[in-house]
Swiss-Prot record:
UniProt family annotation: Belongs to the radical SAM superfamily. RlmN family.
Cofactor binding note from Swiss-Prot or TrEMBL: Binds 1 [4Fe-4S] cluster. The cluster is coordinated with 3 cysteines and an exchangeable S-adenosyl-L-methionine.
Chain sites annotated for binding S-adenosyl-L-methionine: G193, E194, S225, S247, L248, H249, N326
Reactions the enzyme catalyzes: adenosine(2503) in 23S rRNA + 2 reduced [2Fe-2S]-[ferredoxin] + 2 S-adenosyl-L-methionine = 2-methyladenosine(2503) in 23S rRNA + 5'-deoxyadenosine + L-methionine + 2 oxidized [2Fe-2S]-[ferredoxin] + S-adenosyl-L-homocysteine; adenosine(37) in tRNA + 2 reduced [2Fe-2S]-[ferredoxin] + 2 S-adenosyl-L-methionine = 2-methyladenosine(37) in tRNA + 5'-deoxyadenosine + L-methionine + 2 oxidized [2Fe-2S]-[ferredoxin] + S-adenosyl-L-homocysteine
Organism: Yersinia pseudotuberculosis serotype IB (strain PB1/+)
Cofactor section: [4Fe-4S] cluster
Protein name (record): Dual-specificity RNA methyltransferase RlmN
Keyword presence, Flavoprotein: no
Keywords: 4Fe-4S, Cytoplasm, Disulfide bond, Iron, Iron-sulfur, Metal-binding, Methyltransferase, rRNA processing, S-adenosyl-L-methionine, Transferase, tRNA processing
Primary location recorded for the protein, binned into one broad class: cytoplasm
Domain (Radical SAM core): residue spans on this chain: 125-364
């Protein structure tokens, strides 16, 4: 596949795991939104109109290579087909409700999805530009250190609302090309939500990201991050091959049970076994997974816990990203000191692990890891009950 640059809370037990249902929120119009269709579906739609497959490919190229949303701009499409498309289809990406720019070049967009918002973040670096994309409105997993989780869960995003974030960002960044703004080179499913709880919408969206007539990214440049929905991770390996990152954040089950509650259902051993099964199928990961580990002061950052983490990961080929925790109002944690992060990192490197301390980006606009919140109508009964009862969060220190 050729690669191009992009220029132009439901309780855990109630959340869908292996049987992911496509989001069925009614669109605003009866026209088919072509952003909801991957290439196979586009060809089927065009066949129903009596058109050949290459016509679908032509339209996809205009949609994603040039970020066009007006059929009249597609000059190699005959007028009859353009008129037909105007009657039955549309290209409708989510709109930007608000934009914030960080001093470090990071851009955060609040993206309108129906009557709510999700957040999408553009992160430029010297050799790449990464787009962080949301998969759900809110999140069901209730990770205690994450701002999104505190909002509760509302709904899954449609394919058009996921790929539409990439489309909208690529269009904006394309308009800034003259200013030297770097085109998007990587996409990470690390925004709001747990991607594996929305597989039937996330997978087609990632398929479009990697399609030559879509955004044309290589599978090594599209990364899905998960907190450990084991049945869905096994299913993912049969559906698509992308780079994988795992939100581990603890070396032992007792700590992870508290800060990543899904661990009570799928513990670390089960999670890492599923990761190894995925790596056995995948060519996108170079044989190893990225382990994400947020550093919480005196919670999971002792040298003893670094040794425990090394032991825990000894059978799982990986590189480790240590992530300074990014605070949000009301959070019961503190960020690990540089000295504690340093000691933790050195222990892991002594065991031979490639270990990187992630540089915090966009924290002045609340765009850093764990700070995305959007605007969510909280429909999670359990979360609401906790808020009403003022239930404290139990924390262990080390």
């Amino acid at each position: 596949m050729s690669e191009q640059l992009l220029t132009a809370s439901t309780p855990i037990d109630a959340a869908p795991l292996s049987d992911n249902t496509v989001q069925t929120t009614a669109p605003a119009t009866s026209k088919i939104n072509l952003l909801d269709l991957n290439r196979q579906q586009m060809r089927e739609f065009f066949a129903e109109m009596g058109e050949k497959p290459f016509r679908a490919d032509q339209v996809m190229k205009w949609m994603y290579h040039y970020c066009y949303d007006d059929f009249e701009q597609m000059t190699d499409i005959n007028k009859g087909l353009r008129a037909k498309l105007q009657r039955v289809a549309e290209i409708r990406a989510p709109e930007v409700a608000e934009e914030q720019r960080s001093v470090d070049g990071t851009i955060k967009w609040a993206i309108k999805v129906g009557d709510q918002q999700v957040e999408t973040v553009y992160i430029p670096e010297a050799d790449r530009a990464t787009l962080c994309v949301s998969s759900q409105v809110g999140c069901a997993l209730e990770c205690k250190f994450c701002s999104t989780a505190q909002q509760g869960f509302n709904r899954n995003l449609r394919v058009s609302e996921i790929i539409g974030q990439v489309w909208r960002a690529a269009k904006i960044i394309g308009s800034l090309k003259s200013t030297g703004t770097r085109p998007i080179t990587n996409v990470v499913m690390m925004g709001m939500g747990e991607p594996l709880l929305n597989l039937n919408n996330v997978v087609p969206a990632m398929d479009i990201m990697m399609d030559d007539f879509g955004f044309g990214l290589s599978k090594r440049r599209v990364t899905l991050s998960t907190s450990g929905v084991v049945p869905a991770l096994d299913k993912l390996g049969d559906m698509i091959d992308v780079a994988l990152a795992i939100s581990l954040h603890a070396p032992t089950d007792d700590i992870r049970d508290e800060i990543v509650p899904i661990n009570r259902k799928y513990n670390i051993e089960m999670f890492l076994a599923a990761v190894r099964r995925y790596l056995d199928k995948s060519k996108a990961n170079g044989g190893r997974v990225t382990v994400e580990y947020v550093m919480l002061d005196h919670i999971n950052d002792s040298t003893e816990q670094a040794h425990q983490l090394a032991e825990c990961l000894k059978d799982t080929p990986c590189k480790i990203n240590l992530i300074p925790w990014n605070p949000f109002p009301g959070a019961p944690y503190g960020r690990s000191s540089n000295s504690r992060v340093d000691r933790f990192s050195k222990v892991l490197m002594e065991y031979g692990f490639t270990t990187i301390v992630r540089k915090t980006r966009g924290d002045d606009i609340d765009a850093a890891c764990g700070q995305l919140a959007g605007e969510v109508i909280d429909r999670t009964k359990r979360t609401l009950k906790k808020k009403m009862a003022g239930e404290p969060i139990a924390i262990k220190t080390v």
